[in-house]
């Protein structure tokens, strides 16, 4: 067999023509320590802060601490099978989660993976969990109400679309119930809801999901769940993952409501990670940037300008207090970031006033601009009346000789408290809220015994549904009160036919 020089030279020329001098470089580090949800790796000299890293076993982590000798990594998911000496490599991207309509009606973990046993989520879109908040000129003032269906909130501390309203109170005062009822009331309102459960017991989350399913609310809700058995990094990233899912809808011109239940547990998880990464502790052992932890999250909630589609992301963060102390570190931080707070008091809760909203300490700084005119008119004096009643109530127990005006204020106050009570999972449409508050503020309830107020309200609603639906329609569609004489006459007619219970 003879070797021809021409053939060899043509083969070499062919190879040279297709030669590619691009090198595929993977920067790989070695794990030097692993434990409690964090790892340290040596050799990742060019890694970026917040970059996603991949371990040999397929797990992912986020570069959190960039030090001279090694990198501190928080591990996403299980870390039992990561060993010292394992390799970890850069991915060149930051953490992203799947987003879009495919997630609606599903229960997912903070990585966007389904945990409801309903199969794979087919979503081809992703968003980074950390994103820049909309700028000053990208926003507009809150001008559209987000009705919660809860009389005490819609009348006293109204919430607008794009607002951040904190729900704060001790454990077992009804914080989660308020948020769930608000989600239930969004049915038919064209609002997408996201419930982020951070460190909540698996059984509790299961109960909430069943409630949402029972009332048909899972048709427009995404549940993001990071249970107490999950490693701390999962609890830390859960609110950011939920916000990224909400932003996808917001930037497409839709209205979104997101509930963080609760941010106290996220702060505790972040403190745990920071101490394990040996960051210097500050007040209450929280790291120095714990304020930024929550501010960069909540600033992403906004009412976008019309130029950007006019979508909104309304946030209801929940914070748990100890013995009603709202002056602790995390509560004061979040109060200063949000646009108002709903303060729930255990004394009121155990006295049977539910929802246990403390009108004196609760405030909505921007929601008043979004409140409908009819509600603004009927609820105008409600807060001051309620505060005055609370003061009078404490004085009244010391003596029985009260003048007529004081007695009238006490009677009105008792009826106000009774009207604002509301059973669980029973949101009331805004037009019916306006109706009962109109009856209250115009004195139609003054002669009704306190124990009959609830029955009076239900029968009044039924009466208007059957005989005066046009008046309710006017309030619902225009946001204004109908003709004063007509409304008063209808309520008066019903009041005269109402029979109080026999004692």
From Swiss-Prot:
Membrane topology according to the record: Peripheral membrane protein
Binding site for ATP: 169-176
GO molecular function per UniProt: ADP binding; ATP binding; proton-transporting ATP synthase activity, rotational mechanism
Activity modulation comment: Increases 2-fold following exposure to low pH.
Protein keywords: ATP synthesis, ATP-binding, Cell membrane, CF(1), Hydrogen ion transport, Ion transport, Membrane, Nucleotide-binding, Translocase, Transport
One GO cellular component term noted in the UniProt record for this chain: plasma membrane
Top EC group: translocase
Inducers of expression: By low pH.
Family stated for the protein in its record: Belongs to the ATPase alpha/beta chains family.
Protein name: ATP synthase subunit alpha
Organism: Lactobacillus acidophilus (strain ATCC 700396 / NCK56 / N2 / NCFM)
Source lineage: Bacteria, Bacillati, Bacillota, Bacilli, Lactobacillales
